[in-house]
Amino acid sequence: MLPDVVTFWHGPLDALRMLCLKSQVAAGHKVTVYSFDSLAGLPDGVGNAEAEAILPHAFAERLRPSGPDGAWRDWTTLQFSDFFRMRLMARGEGLWLDADVLLQKPVEIDPGKPYFAWERPRQLGNSVLYLPSDNHAVVAFEELMEQEELTPPFPASSSCPAANRTSWRPPT
């Protein structure tokens, strides 16, 4: 199956991201960039959708470090996009590609199976991501976002004995 491609962007898009978005359209994918502000000059065939409808901007406040200016920092945007992509997976919106992923050919997936990119040997990344909406990780993220504290119930630090595993696997 040739999935729709979805991504999130905050701020102006540079030439590299524009080229990558063009490559995704040229590969035959329907591409949608979600943002809080309208994005000018998107390549032909790339749609722009309102991010607020997926995950409200107010959610970013839960990620913001305490600081005097309260401005978004790069890492706050990165963390927000991690939650945003999982919300897109929960809604079955399509294949997540970071805006700097260049495609040379279409990406075909089996919609019933997870799809990840390898960043390093033995380390999955989330720059290319597809998860069925009923996947355990998607369900866990949805539950996490409903909590007052954004503390995951799965291993995330070396203080947790299970964190020494090579990868976390959801219970079956």
What are these regions (language model features)?
Residues 18-22, 85-86, 104, 161-165:
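Short amphipathic alpha-helical segments and helix-helix/interface helices
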Residues 1-57, 133, 167-168:
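N-terminal anchoring/stem segment of glycosyltransferases
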Residues 39-83:
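Active-site-proximal specificity loops/subdomain of glycosyltransferases
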Residues 142-172:
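Catalytic core and acceptor-binding pocket of nucleotide-sugar-dependent glycosyltransferases
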Residues 134-140:
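Short helix-loop capping/hinge motifs at secondary-structure junctions, enriched
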Residues 77-124, 128-133:
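GT-A fold catalytic core of metal-dependent nucleotide-sugar glycosyltransferases
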Residues 10-17, 74-82, 152-158:
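Aromatic-acidic/polar surface patches that form glycan- and anion
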